[in-house]
């Protein structure tokens, strides 16, 4: 996330030379130019994929930010993307966010798997590699084996070490799942925008190739760990396929992010550990 204004040539390429920018701190470090938002992108391939997908995707009961192409047709220019501005802000309406995820994933069910989702994380890591590695850790037979083999730096902080211990314990509780993977948005907590009674909005799609109930599980794990959700949230979605096993992999994923991410804070761990205990009780 950056607060640096988009450079003049980027603004010009998106046709935004005449408009005064307004900083939108919480919109992924974006800048608003009238009806258009310029945001810095963390990963070019993912940003271009998200833009292309959002250009035509239609989802019942969801407003999607549409990409604004540069004058030469590009989605990403010098590390910036442009989208239509959506009114709204994240709110702790956790059940509604899970509902949004189910509607979104009906619409993404027929999308092909992008090539970049099959690529392993590469050293030296950037932000996106941390999430790829953490995602793999939750599903591979021996969590984090590939990372250790690749010489990745695993956390040495007390909470980081505790995260790694928990991942090892939780891994033994996994059973094979049958729900097929598809294209899902793996980071919906805190990214769905609400504006009163208006239709919820979404500005980006963070792609993973996993089962739909796993993506719902990540929302629930995040909401319980950091969003002040009531404990009943866990049970209200128990009808989703293979729910306990999906929650298990979702909490392993978040624990792995905690252990691997350089900006993890000790304060984030207690909520996550408590959620891991709750998930254990569902198995």
Where are these regions (language model features)?
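Short, conserved active-site entrance elements at the starts or edges of catalytic domains
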Residues: 2-5, 148-181
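ATP-binding pocket architecture of kinase catalytic cores
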Residues: 21, 26-115
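A cross-family kinase active-site recognition segment
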Residues: 91-158
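ATP/Mg2+ or Mg2+-diphosphate-binding catalytic cores
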Residues: 257-283
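Active-site acidic catalytic loop and adjacent metal/ATP-binding pocket
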Residues: 26-39, 67, 168-212
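Juxta-kinase regulatory segment immediately upstream of eukaryotic protein kinase catalytic domains
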Residues: 1-18
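A structured, mid-to-C-terminal "fold-capping" secondary-structure block
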Residues: 232-260
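Active-site Asp-x-Gly
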Residues: 195-243
